Amino acid sequence: MPITSLSDYDAPDRILFPKRSNGALVNEQAALDALVDLLDLEVIEVNIFRGISPDENRQRVFGGQVAGQALVAAARTVDHGNIHSLHAYFLRPGDPLVPILYEVDRIRDGKSFTTRRVVAIQHGKAIFNMQASFHHDEPGLEHQLDIPIVPSPLTLPDFRTRMTPYKDQIGAWYDQPRPIDTRYIGRMPVERVGSQEPFQRVWLKAAGTLPDDPVLHACILTYASDMTLLDTTMLPHGMTFWDGRVQMASLDHAMWFHRPFRADGWLLYDQHTPSTSNSRGLAYGSIYTQDGRLVVSVVQEGLIRVTA
């Protein structure tokens, strides 16, 4: 059952997910714990929550953070059922220096489905909105596409190892602990030269262990799903986000949650792009567990603006 109220734990007001007391955490686990804290929200009033951004040198808030926090806000108001779909629009760049208010509209509480609308606000203006739908578990027909045949994530180097040749170019970012472990199958974007096929595959997982709460796992994967996907839209053009001529930003994001999963287990993010045009790129993602279950489908459109 989703955690929907602060009374579920004997903890301070900002706690949604249980904390660990182990002080000997490795860097990645500490980074993951910091992400869990980031996704926790302060209750301001009924249906109103406040989130913060990490103390990082960013010009704007990472879109996955806003989407993950918005899903937390929606889930806080739902008594029963699990998230089965969300549809979101990124309206304005988020300011990382000020908190984000999340206002939840309880659209519908039905017998099988519950619908919520969430608006994220900064400086008196909406920067993001999301519609999320929750569904009671219900038996029915089952089918899915098979997982592609790919190398095991344990045979692939992690992100930091792959980026070692470029560490002088990226500076302090290279040494920063990462809450999400990403392992590319084949070349990473920075390693590619010339036009490529319009698809890529990435293994990802939370870089540590998480509590069992399914709301938390859905929110962590929502955060992570905004990573790497738009890369595919530039593969046919021989360009990457490292190119100084390219401006990239998420415009909208949709997810469908098909089956249970753990975000701290390996997940294959199978990605492809059908089209890029009018300075917008569209990308699809299918997310599989390591044992082959299709658990989430993702579609994202992004701004892909190239300057001369």
Residue spans of the language-model regions?
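Terminal targeting signals and extreme-terminal segments of soluble enzymes
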Residues: 2-308
